[in-house]
Design a protein with these regions (language model features):
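Fold-core signature of tandem repeat domains
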Residues: 74, 78-80, 97, 101, ...
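Extracellular beta-strand-rich, repetitive "passenger/adhesive" scaffolds
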Residues: 33-52, 63-72, 83-96, 107-138, ...
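General marker for long, soluble alpha-helical cores
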Residues: 163, 185, 206, 211, ...
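Hydrophobic alpha-helical membrane segments, chiefly transmembrane helices and signal peptide h-regions
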Residues: 12-22, 142-145, 246-251, 255
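Secretory targeting and sorting signals
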Residues: 1-29
Length: 266
């Protein structure tokens, strides 16, 4: 019941985020000093919408989403400030980031939506605003989050590293279907649930000190499912345990070594 209720709440949030008209205030400067997105209220499903444009940078301090079918080019960084919300996972869009995506303490970073059958065995998450649509998101640098409340990365191309350290909350963390040209590092997170699934990682994948707290299902574990890792897959301190998936054959494919709790998941 708790899981169903949470799913319903998250669905409502996603739909509201996708369909909300711009509210609050936002400052755009095209290719000038950048764009600061303010306003919105995540608690009431009110969002400021970021429109199509080329920006020097984007800074998110409020609750912000992406316009339906927007084409956004950011020559520098996207910064989600502490407590900010960036919902780029509810409406189809094309987003290209020249440098890095950085999420601060207590923030929510959501990137990517697609038809269910685009990732693994129906592991994709459809765009709430247009279920048959999809996002195309490319980050030419790194994606990093420090003490974030929630991080959702689905079918994102990252030409650098993905580094997630600390934080967590009542929303499941999902790192799935991504292409990561360097390393994936996830550490010191206590969240409802966390899954690293169906990713292609050119370097190492290191998951340490992660706790899944889902109160509705005591059997819930950290999921490490069908990733292709060119170098090493390393897992330590995953509580209450680690799962390799429910379908036979959903093992991870590792070029060098699988160590720790993930040694048996290859």
């Amino acid at each position: 019941m708790q899981r169903a209720t949470r799913a319903s709440i998250l669905g409502s949030i996603a739909i509201a985020a996708a369909l909300a008209l711009p509210t609050g205030s936002a400052m755009a400067a095209g290719q000038g000093p950048g764009y600061t997105c303010t306003g919105g209220d995540f608690a009431t499903n009110t969002f400021t919408t970021i429109p199509s444009a080329t920006y020097a940078s984007i800074t998110v301090t409020g609750a912000c989403n992406i316009a339906l079918n927007a084409v956004i080019n950011v020559t520098g960084n996207i910064n989600v400030a502490p407590g900010g919300v960036l919902d780029a996972q509810s409406a189809p869009s094309t987003i290209t980031v020249g440098h890095n995506v950085i999420a601060g303490s207590g923030s929510l970073l959501g990137l990517g939506c697609q038809p269910a059958n685009w990732i693994g065995m129906f592991a994709g998450v459809p765009c709430a605003a247009e279920p048959t649509g999809h996002t195309t998101i490319t980050v030419n640098g790194n994606v990093s989050a420090t003490n974030a409340n929630t991080v959702l990365l689905r079918m994102v191309t990252v030409h650098g590293n993905v580094s997630l350290s600390g934080g967590g909350g009542d929303i499941p963390w999902s790192i799935k279907g991504d292409t990561i040209d360097r390393n994936l590092t996830i550490s010191n997170i206590t969240a409802d649930w966390l899954g690293a699934q169906f990713n292609k990682i050119a370097g190492n994948a290191v998951l340490t000190n992660i706790t899944a707290t889902d109160p509705g299902d005591p059997g819930r574990t950290v999921a490490v499912v069908e990733n292709t890792v060119a170098r090493n897959l390393i897992c330590f301190g995953l509580e209450p345990g680690v799962s390799g998936g429910f379908i036979p054959g959903e093992v991870n494919h590792v070029g060098h070594q699988a160590l720790g709790q993930c040694a048996a998941l290859v």
